[in-house]
């Protein structure tokens, strides 16, 4: 598959890092982390671990997002065409979203 036909892996990685950082801050604020004695002794609490993704995981994530978005647009286009419209609107995406999420 051509690299131009997929999402930029640097962008996806930046989005993942942003989400991981936000979840880390939320966990710290809520103090919901209960470290066991073994974790404290080993220094492996969730607070100490940094989330990361390797290159293959990022490529796979990009391909999955590409497939998801492509399928969403195709399904929404079918609904729009059935209604006699030339453009896809948010309501078309809203109608296909439940089944799309179940399919993925």
UniProtKB/Swiss-Prot annotation:
Compartment list: Nucleus
Query: Mind telling me which GO cellular component terms the entry cites?
Result: nucleus
Tell me which Pfam families the record gives.
CENP-X (PF09415)
UniProtKB keywords? DNA damage, DNA recombination, DNA repair, DNA-binding, Nucleus
- Its primary localisation, in coarse terms, equals nucleus
Superkingdom of the organism of origin: Eukaryota
Which molecular-function annotations from GO does this UniProt entry contain?
DNA binding
* Single GO BP term: DNA recombination
Question: Belongs to which family?
Answer: Belongs to the CENP-X/MHF2 family.
UniProt function note: Acts in the same pathway as FANCM to restrain class II meiotic crossing over (CO), and acts with FANCM during meiosis to repair interstrand cross-links (ICLs).
What's this protein's name? Protein MHF2 homolog
Q: Which organism is it from?
A: Arabidopsis thaliana (Mouse-ear cress)
Gene name, Swiss-Prot/TrEMBL: MHF2
């Amino acid at each position: 598959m051509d690299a131009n036909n997929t999402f930029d892996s640097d962008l996806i990685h930046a989005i993942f890092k942003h989400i991981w950082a936000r979840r880390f801050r939320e966990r710290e604020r809520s103090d919901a982390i209960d470290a066991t004695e073994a974790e404290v002794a080993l220094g492996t609490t969730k607070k100490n671990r940094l989330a990361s993704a390797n290159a293959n995981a990022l490529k796979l994530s990009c391909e999955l997002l590409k497939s998801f978005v492509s399928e969403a647009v195709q399904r929404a286009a079918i609904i729009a065409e059935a209604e006699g419209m030339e453009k896809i609107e948010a309501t078309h995406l809203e109608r296909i979203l439940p089944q799309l999420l179940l399919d993925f």
